[in-house]
Amino acid sequence: MSTTKEQQAVGPQPHVAELGTTSAPLKSAAFFIGAYCKEFNEDFMLCKAESRDPAHCLKEGRRVTRCATDLITKMRENCLEQFESHWACLEQNNHQYYRCRTVERPLNTCMFEKLGLVKTIPGTPEGRKQIHEIENPVLKRQQK
Amino acid sequence: MPVPWEALIPSALLVTMFGVTGTLANITFRAQNQWKPPRYHLERWDEMMIARDNRLTGHNRGQTSDPVIPSRAASS
């Protein structure tokens, strides 16, 4: 396979396999990836803020991919059943979190016990309970 | 035929036909989405993720939580 001009410009790069997880499991794991990979994600976003050129942030991008792959592997080892049921519920419900709270709670407790990761939504106003922790939310699904 | 319930016969026919239409429509939508409800209110982000799912699994609604990428989709 011949190299493109851009590939020749950056030189040979270490190979990191892309993450093979599809959209529903990623959405289910999203806040845990945010908690686990915070430093790498922030590094990558700051790097992108400097320059949108793809060649500029290859190293930070590799780190993000490795961290996310690591977390998904750990999630599957420790909390497979809750993880699978949560993203199956999301698949049935247009990937909307508020419709899958009953299945999300066991996943959050399992992740906290086994891996110590807590789902926090950044930007929640001070003093307000996290939306996923409210027992009887006003906006909820039609059926119980 | 002059019976008290004669108007209910075409009403029942209408209800049945609407029901059949709705059921067949539901079946066609679900059949294209691997027997799951279709996605709606899709943004550009969602469309890009669905295209990525297609590259990874071969179908727009195919899902897998396996972090190992199959070789045919090795460049996402």
Residues covered by each model-derived region:
Chain A
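Mitochondrial intermembrane space
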Residues: 1-144
